[in-house]
Amino acid sequence: MKDLLNFLKAQHKTEEFDAIKIGLASPDMIRSWSFGEVKKPETINYRTFKPERDGLFCARIFGPVKDYECLCGKYKRLKHRGVICEKCGVEVTQTKVRRDRMGHIELASPVAHIWFLKSLPSRIGLLMDMPLRDIERVLYFEMYVVTEPGMTDLERGQMLTEEEYLDRLEEWGDEFTAKMGAEAIKDLLASMDLPAEAEQMREELDTTNSETKRKKLTKRLKLVEAFVASGNKPEWMILTVLPVLPPDLRPLVPLDGGRFATSDLNDLYRRVINRNNRLKRLLELAAPDIIVRNEKRMLQESVDALLDNGRRGRAITGSNKRPLKSLADMIKGKQGRFRQNLLGKRVDYSGRSVITVGPYLRLHQCGLPKKMALELFKPFIYSKLETRGLATTIKAAKKMVEREEAVVWDILDEVIREHPVLLNRAPTLHRLGIQAFEPVLIEGKAIQLHPLVCAAYNADFDGDQMAVHVPLTLEAQLEARTLMMSTNNILSPASGDPIIVPSQDVVLGLYYMTREKINAKGEGMYLTGPAEAEKAYRTKTAELHARVKVRITETIKHENGKLTTETKMIDTTVGRAMLWQIVPKGLPYSLVNQKLGKKQISNLLNEAYRKLGLKDTVIFADQIMYTGFAYAALSGVSVGIDDMVVPAAKYTEIAEAEEEVREIQEQFQSGLVTAGERYNKVIDIWASTNDRVAKAMMENLSSEQVINRQGEQEKQESFNSIYMMADSGARGSAAQIRQLAGMRGLMARPDGSIIETPITANFKEGLNVLQYFISTHGARKGLADTALKTANSGYLTRRLVDVAQDVVVTEHDCGTLEGVVMTPHIEGGDVKVALTELALGRVVSEDILKPGTDEVLIPRNTLLDEKWCKVINDNSVDQIKVRSVVTCDSDFGCCAQCYGRDLARGHLVNQGEAVGVIAAQSIGEPGTQLTMRTFHIGGAASTAAAENSIQAKNNGSVKLHNAKFVTNKDGKLVITSRASELTIIDEFGRTKEKHKLPYGSMLSKADGDAVAAGETVANWEAHTMPIITEVAGRVQFVDMIDGVTVSRQTDDLTGLSSSEVTEAAARPAAGKDMRPAIKLVDANGKDVLIPGTDMPAQYFLPGKAIVNLDDGAEVNVGDTLARIPQKSGGNKDITGGLPRVADLFEARKPKEPAILAEHSGTVSFGKETKGKRRLIITRDSGDTYEEMIPKHRQLNVFEGERIERGDVIADGPESPHDILRLRGIHAVTTYIANEVQEVYRLQGVKINDKHIETIVRQMLRKCTITFAGDSEFLPGETVEYSQVKIANRKLVEEGKEPARFERELLGITKASLATESFISAASFQETTRVLTEAAVSGKRDDLRGLKENVIVGRLIPAGTGFAYHQDRQAKRAQEQQGPSAEQATDNLAALLNAGFSSDDE
């Protein structure tokens, strides 16, 4: 009985575990794993193919080669199980033990483990505080190291050369010991007293002041403490016993012809064993030192190669000149264990085939070829045949299926009914790349796919292939049906818009059906309803496009779900009335009573989903598709060459343009314009010509003259096939039609610059050779780009998934009061994104009040749905504070309230939803649509004039934000602050426009003034920065000496003089320390004070400033004292597209970032150095902060000006790290979200902000401790934010002082590698480094994220696995109290019963 129980236990040895710990293995531990020592390098006998004894494949050590049979054949069969044969020493058991029994090699001399030696930073080096060079010299027998100084004046760890060693030996004899090789290092490591070292370093940390020293000490202290805490011993980094991998994991297979295919590891092990045995023999023979040393060095090198080939020196190569694959290579990289076998496995019950269209399928169906279905569902068919008694055994059933008897097909039908299958199309860029369908059996060999899901799969039918997978268990079928069925995935998880949207033919059909035609047959009929309209159409009494009056009954769905009907006569067309028949009840007729393009149809489906729910929408979508196909066929729309009408105006336009170009060419030759101007002007001419031709062509195509019923001429939209395709959004665009019938226009070179000779021909006329050649030039680059883009985009997605994989919704509400403030997205005069669009699906974090009152409109913690958004719009609320993932307070993952609505489902997100992965997929999936290029600002773009005024685009009133200003003598306001903004607000208080106001702008309107559209509100000089006086008085020059600090020029024409301040570097010696300034004095020559301060009004002038005033001139408030010319922006390349998104998420610092003020205070300038300026900020408390700024940077601040922390001192692209440090988390979140959205918006891709916020949350995972308090942390160390939060909570509860910290922003790659989980980090990148670090510090992985759980083969803690994990946690908490006695007895009884009732062997 006991044996039976033990046997059963041995069969199911998957103990449940909750964490994985990694550490260093001690020699005893390695011996305890081992089943015997491998003594010989032999593998198998080449004649008998039996493993050699004591060799690498030895059956005595590793187990039998055949199941339950010893090597010599004395014991066979199950009955001898567990017997050890006395002849060959092999245990009789299953052969699969050869997969997990390890051996070992006793090394004749210790060997350093290369990972801890060479993986930077070297752990051995750091621990012993010795340079890596020195350690290597000792290990490879070049120098001696003192291990025991004894009574001599040597020091422990001192390096000695051969000569020095011999000298010392003569001097002191055996007073001291010095050794070389790994033994020496081992002795040094073993003799270290780690706790004492740690103590000493802590004391040193408190006393030392040097920053570099502190950094070094902190690093070393952390390592030492990790060793102490984990129970690892430092000497274990030196190997004395080498474990041997089980033989079935490094197989050796005989090929025919007497050759063998073998794993590289066998070669590497053979080398080690050979050298080890030779070393043993040499030691026994007491060979000369030099020979032994050489052998030991070779042993070290061969062990290095086995563990990590190529890490040190040249890689050992096999017979084919390729480096051998070592143990480290087995686990790292795309082909390594992690990514090849653990994160992505191939599965059975799957098939793949080409896809074709299934236009007659329902949305939840797919067509599956019978042949394929038969193969996939074989086991189900066998079992059915058996239970029905149609086949006696499985073998018989197999025969029946192979013969394909008639009954088999009937059973296949039954088996398949309501058994969903999964269809997947590679690349699976987001979760809609795998969906479930019910299979319908079809003839042929191609899978049929429903046209409406093509958008989600990004599939077309030009030879795409798809894979089919069969969910086997009931749970899997249930999940496939409830969660993955195509009918349950109508909305896109990225934006919440419908993704089941008709395209191409369907759109064209519906568009054709809903167009109107003047004077069509049957115009003016009165019809009793859609049915009669259809009858009229079918009997040919009325055309599809005829304008008629029809009696329509609308059903209105009310808030409470009640339905009421309303009937009225509506002016419409026959086609629209017929379409109304398929529209579900509850939608208004106005949605159909228009010409339906792609946008309108999408809107129609969206409305249906929001108002009527899932089921009606799905049925409706199918009906739309069938109708669309039917009428596209009836329309007879086709592409004919005569449909491309070339406008007559084209030739005259081109002739005019050529004339203009000729003129500019002449001007250039006579030197009136520069080469650059000529190029830009030529390009502008051709671009505008192209536009004019295109406009003429579109006007020509889009309308035609017809005679209406009154016999008059009337214009109507044309029924030109090509125009209809483009107008409906089915295929093609205005830009493409322009190339067909207008002119092709300007072409780009591969570097993005524009070729100045345009292609004047179009495709209808045909291109000549030159034109064809020009057009291939840029087009080829496009193709190359696309190939690169795909790889880049895939890599971005991989990094995003990796950083965000463990963000799961873990609780309903974290209880935080924090949130982010949402305002509409306004650029210049346009509202780009409305507030309601941004806030939809978010949870309000504080009560929204009715503007101007204290009445609560929306209470906090309300989920904003479409209904509430209407309330926000109607009350013209301008900003809302909503909860955000970034500010969520959950320790792990985030909470449902902070995330808000699940976009793909339309309600509050469920607990267990893997929102991190969804966010990563939503950002990564459109990556292939983004451009790869860096835009060169060339051609038309660079000539745009710099802005110098603000014109209102809407009526409303002016509002100024954080603006300081003075009023000048004309009564105009002059701005004297930096970061001012001007907004224009409509009568409801909604922000319509937002503009930046530069320093020195003149406003013609004051705060609160009314403004009309088109009025100029503010203006300023574009290329200079003024210095504005805030007081009136008389000018007095200080330190402004002509020829020393300033140079005066007098204009010959006007006679006016101006002085330009010379830069400090260019002045003669006398003027170096002078500081030119303009002081304002009153009539008696006394200093005028700046209002509100006791500082005299003195304005220091930077270099290059130009002063147009004379000494003693009178000035008024708001006058310009001096002007500083601004360098124009120049042609800076803008990084756009995919690289820009990657830069943002990697949090890369820009080349020349904007310089932001570190503190609030008053600015002054100190002594300058050769290339830098010294900027001093005096804080209100009186202490100063200095910063050196390169001279070539243009500063935005003057001496004596007050600035706030985070203000821009020098312009440039802002660095996200600075934004976080100086303006906080909200600012950096907004910055990254807006910048990323900018790129996607250009491509017309919609992504919800919350996905970007989820990634930003993960980038902010770490923080740096600034003050340790009573915590365990060290100041300056970087710790997981959640760790600090939990630790501080504890400290506060105990009444101790919590640690203080600053949040850090990490790029996504860094953040992925810095996760808590070493398994996840190791499977991402830099596997060796991650594992080395984890092993040394004895890390424990709690398997919190998704990736770790996939790798160890458990259910993931998300989705349906979330409940399972919650359960386990609750159980564990219970178990810590311990089970009761009764429970224990029950458990035992259950075990025994299980043992008896089992029908296992």
Curated annotation (Swiss-Prot):
<feature type="binding site">
    <location>
        <position position="72"/>
    </location>
    <ligand>
        <name>Zn(2+) 1</name>
    </ligand>
</feature>
<dbReference type="GO" id="GO:0000287">
    <property type="term" value="F:magnesium ion binding"/>
</dbReference>
<keyword id="KW-0548">Nucleotidyltransferase</keyword>
<feature type="binding site">
    <location>
        <position position="85"/>
    </location>
    <ligand>
        <name>Zn(2+) 1</name>
    </ligand>
</feature>
<dbReference type="InterPro" id="IPR007080">
    <property type="entry name" value="RNA_pol_Rpb1_1"/>
</dbReference>
<keyword id="KW-0479">Metal-binding</keyword>
<feature type="binding site">
    <location>
        <position position="88"/>
    </location>
    <ligand>
        <name>Zn(2+) 1</name>
    </ligand>
</feature>
<dbReference type="Pfam" id="PF04998">
    <property type="entry name" value="RNA_pol_Rpb1_5"/>
</dbReference>
<feature type="compositionally biased region" description="Polar residues">
    <location>
        <begin position="1375"/>
        <end position="1386"/>
    </location>
</feature>
<dbReference type="InterPro" id="IPR007081">
    <property type="entry name" value="RNA_pol_Rpb1_5"/>
</dbReference>
<feature type="region of interest" description="Disordered">
    <location>
        <begin position="1368"/>
        <end position="1387"/>
    </location>
</feature>
<feature type="binding site">
    <location>
        <position position="464"/>
    </location>
    <ligand>
        <name>Mg(2+)</name>
    </ligand>
</feature>
<feature type="binding site">
    <location>
        <position position="70"/>
    </location>
    <ligand>
        <name>Zn(2+) 1</name>
    </ligand>
</feature>
<dbReference type="GO" id="GO:0003677">
    <property type="term" value="F:DNA binding"/>
</dbReference>
<dbReference type="Pfam" id="PF04983">
    <property type="entry name" value="RNA_pol_Rpb1_3"/>
</dbReference>
<dbReference type="InterPro" id="IPR044893">
    <property type="entry name" value="RNA_pol_Rpb1_clamp_domain"/>
</dbReference>
<dbReference type="InterPro" id="IPR045867">
    <property type="entry name" value="DNA-dir_RpoC_beta_prime"/>
</dbReference>
<dbReference type="InterPro" id="IPR042102">
    <property type="entry name" value="RNA_pol_Rpb1_3_sf"/>
</dbReference>
<dbReference type="InterPro" id="IPR006592">
    <property type="entry name" value="RNA_pol_N"/>
</dbReference>
<comment type="subunit">
    <text>The RNAP catalytic core consists of 2 alpha, 1 beta, 1 beta' and 1 omega subunit. When a sigma factor is associated with the core the holoenzyme is formed, which can initiate transcription.</text>
</comment>
<dbReference type="Pfam" id="PF00623">
    <property type="entry name" value="RNA_pol_Rpb1_2"/>
</dbReference>
<keyword id="KW-0804">Transcription</keyword>
<keyword id="KW-0808">Transferase</keyword>
<dbReference type="GO" id="GO:0008270">
    <property type="term" value="F:zinc ion binding"/>
</dbReference>
<protein>
    <recommendedName>
        <fullName>DNA-directed RNA polymerase subunit beta'</fullName>
        <ecNumber>2.7.7.6</ecNumber>
    </recommendedName>
</protein>
<keyword id="KW-0862">Zinc</keyword>
<feature type="binding site">
    <location>
        <position position="895"/>
    </location>
    <ligand>
        <name>Zn(2+) 2</name>
    </ligand>
</feature>
<feature type="binding site">
    <location>
        <position position="898"/>
    </location>
    <ligand>
        <name>Zn(2+) 2</name>
    </ligand>
</feature>
<keyword id="KW-0460">Magnesium</keyword>
<feature type="binding site">
    <location>
        <position position="814"/>
    </location>
    <ligand>
        <name>Zn(2+) 2</name>
    </ligand>
</feature>
<dbReference type="GO" id="GO:0003899">
    <property type="term" value="F:DNA-directed RNA polymerase activity"/>
</dbReference>
<comment type="function">
    <text>DNA-dependent RNA polymerase catalyzes the transcription of DNA into RNA using the four ribonucleoside triphosphates as substrates.</text>
</comment>
<keyword id="KW-0240">DNA-directed RNA polymerase</keyword>
<dbReference type="InterPro" id="IPR012754">
    <property type="entry name" value="DNA-dir_RpoC_beta_prime_bact"/>
</dbReference>
<dbReference type="InterPro" id="IPR007066">
    <property type="entry name" value="RNA_pol_Rpb1_3"/>
</dbReference>
<dbReference type="GO" id="GO:0006351">
    <property type="term" value="P:DNA-templated transcription"/>
</dbReference>
<dbReference type="GO" id="GO:0000428">
    <property type="term" value="C:DNA-directed RNA polymerase complex"/>
</dbReference>
<feature type="binding site">
    <location>
        <position position="888"/>
    </location>
    <ligand>
        <name>Zn(2+) 2</name>
    </ligand>
</feature>
<dbReference type="InterPro" id="IPR007083">
    <property type="entry name" value="RNA_pol_Rpb1_4"/>
</dbReference>
<feature type="binding site">
    <location>
        <position position="460"/>
    </location>
    <ligand>
        <name>Mg(2+)</name>
    </ligand>
</feature>
<dbReference type="Pfam" id="PF05000">
    <property type="entry name" value="RNA_pol_Rpb1_4"/>
</dbReference>
<comment type="similarity">
    <text>Belongs to the RNA polymerase beta' chain family.</text>
</comment>
